[in-house]
Amino acid sequence: MIWTLAPFVALLPLVTAQQVGTTADAHPRLTTYKCTSQNGCTRQNTSVVLDAATHFIHKKGTQTSCTNSNGLDTAICPDKQTCADNCVVDGITDYASYGVQTKNDTLTLQQYLQTGNATKSLSPRVYLLAEDGENYSMLKLLNQEFTFDVDASTLVCGMNGALYLSEMEASGGKSSLNQAGAKYGTGYCDAQCYTTPWINGEGNTESVGSCCQEMDIWEANARATGLTPHPCNTTGLYECSGSGCGDSGVCDKAGCGFNPYGLGAKDYYGYGLKVNTNETFTVVTQFLTNDNTTSGQLSEIRRLYIQNGQVIQNAAVTSGGKTVDSITKDFCSGEGSAFNRLGGLEEMGHALGRGMVLALSIWNDAGSFMQWLDGGSAGPCNATEGNPALIEKLYPDTHVKFSKIRWGDIGSTYRH
């Protein structure tokens, strides 16, 4: 996922529970399903939490934020310990005001909130919590499939409704310096290695980057879509510095992506096309191993769609002189690519085997208008229609709906 503005990860508190503040987080319920070939799909009483940086993190006993336009307020946070002593995180009680709504097994994410004549940009990002509400749900997807329904019909050019996996810690990095943990959305990381004010819930007083493996199952709007693994040659959250955070560093920032339009299938995905984004459809992603076991080596990432009861095979495209319809070692074999230098599918598979956290978000891109996803050779959108100012003016109701999120044995999550 290529963010142009770093999403902030928050700190939180030290030894006493008071450091978490007096307002508990609401954690909207979102039913998900775990599936097996033998027993079908079982309901899970899971919930979501907004990223910690969305929460108000302030100096204890005051309304003074622990961050400013330059990052951490160094008067409050001169070092990690003092930062943890000083800063408190407040829970969020009204998720709708942050663009997040759930109903049974459906999650709706809104980009904008309209109040009277005013429009506020929100860009919410949430993580899936386990049934205990204290830890993230850890998805182990080797030789498994992940499936969801999506309504992307209002996601115009320049928007990105994303569903992806991050190798965060189950606890959100909970520690003596971070008593908030996953319950308050701490611990975010991805393959872009951004330098954020907080890392694993602790003040980033040394200005390091936060890296981890990232599996972009779904980055899309109504006009284009991408499926992209981003391996790193590290395990879990890794704090980078200098060149280790850059394009030649520990993570593959670009990834090895499968975008049907970008690979030549220009009539496959979009309004009124084979996968018709005017309507809701189902997305199935399979993580196949070399020996068809959950302990094998990741060898292929396959994609299927289902719409109006019909299974739609992934677009068959030409790459490297061959017809391909999935992500394999051969597909990603570009000479000198960071993907292969950093371990490729095998390394990505290690993270999928250890367990990854599900993140869901909506955002737009003031830096490049999301052209890397849907413009130029990647999609049909022109150079300016993804401008967030234009989207806000013309499409203030842009949103994404994810529903019926389920995962389990290959072939167990859909009818075929």
UniProtKB/Swiss-Prot annotation:
It is found in: Secreted. It comes from the Eukaryota. Gene3D superfamilies: Glycoside hydrolase, family 7, domain (2.70.100.10). Residues 1-17 form the signal peptide. Optimum pH is 4.0. Stable between pH 3.0 and 7.0. The keyword Glycoprotein applies. Its EC number is 3.2.1.4. GO terms for molecular function: cellulase activity. The active site is at residues 214, 219. GO terms for cellular component: extracellular region. The keyword Hydrolase applies. It catalyses: Endohydrolysis of (1->4)-beta-D-glucosidic linkages in cellulose, lichenin and cereal beta-D-glucans. Glycans are attached at residues 45, 104, 117, 135, 233, 278, 292, 382. Keywords: Carbohydrate metabolism, Cellulose degradation, Glycoprotein, Glycosidase, Hydrolase, Polysaccharide degradation, Secreted, Signal. Belongs to the glycosyl hydrolase 7 (cellulase C) family. Has endoglucanase activity on substrates containing beta-1,4 glycosidic bonds, like in carboxymethylcellulose (CMC), hydroxyethylcellulose (HEC) and beta-glucan. Involved in the degradation of complex natural cellulosic substrates. This is Endo-beta-1,4-glucanase celB. It comes from Aspergillus oryzae (strain ATCC 42149 / RIB 40). The gene is celB.
